[in-house]
UniProtKB/Swiss-Prot annotation:
TM stretches of this protein: none
An annotated GO BP: ribosomal small subunit biogenesis
Keyword DNA repair: no
Annotated source species: Lactococcus lactis subsp. cremoris (strain SK11)
Comment text on domains: The PRC barrel domain binds ribosomal protein uS19.
Classification of source organism: Bacteria, Bacillati, Bacillota, Bacilli, Lactobacillales
UniProt-listed InterPro entries: PRC-brl_dom, PRC_barrel-like_sf, RimM, RimM_N, RimM_N_sf, Transl_B-barrel_sf
Entry keyword set: Chaperone, Cytoplasm, Ribosome biogenesis, rRNA processing
Protein's name in the database: Ribosome maturation factor RimM
């Protein structure tokens, strides 16, 4: 099977007409959840279920309300709560130099002054900037905003991120 990459999680239903709320995990949410987009549905055990074609999608707060073709009632979609929607690798957008996908960053080692401090486990999108969650041994997770003074260098090929932890970020 080809490579697929997560673009969102179905977190709930919306209304009675078969719409779902999708929590996006992509910087290309407008493209992924727009009319005509094709997504692959995976269950909570990461088993492929089926391809879905977006009939309509709209942003509502921090969710996308999406209607897929062929689903007309809440009963058709209720069972998909907690399932993940992904895109096939060949459907990924081409990126500019210095840009990267979440899956290329998650799992990367994080260094400050050439000292390993942990690994990126998750990327959050709380607002203006992404926040990278760094898992550390024996310490609580470190939340790093993805801003130039903090993230100094990202080497996707080496799975390495160099950072400068500003005062107050590690309290």
């Amino acid at each position: 099977m080809e490579n697929f990459y997560k673009v969102g999680t179905i977190v709930n239903t919306q209304g009675l007409q078969g719409e779902v709320r999708v929590l996006p995990s992509t910087d290309f949410a407008n493209e992924r959840f727009s009319k005509g987009a094709v997504l692959a549905l995976f269950d909570d055990k990461d088993n492929y279920i089926q391809d879905l074609k977006v009939k309509s999608g709209r942003l509502q707060k921090n969710f996308y309300v999406v209607k897929f073709e062929g689903f007309y009632h809440i009963n058709d979609v209720e069972k998909y709560k907690g399932y993940v929607v992904k895109i096939a690798q060949e459907n990924q957008e081409e990126l500019n130099d210095g840009e990267f996908y979440y899956h290329e960053i998650i799992g990367s080692d994080v260094y400050e002054n050439d000292i390993l401090i942990g690994q990126i486990s998750e990327i959050l999108q709380p607002g203006a900037n992404d926040v990278w969650v760094v898992k550390r041994k024996g310490k609580r997770d470190l939340l790093l905003p993805y801003i130039p003074p903090v993230v100094l260098k990202v080497d996707v090929a080496q799975h390495r991120v160099d950072v400068d932890i500003m005062e107050g970020l590690d309290d």
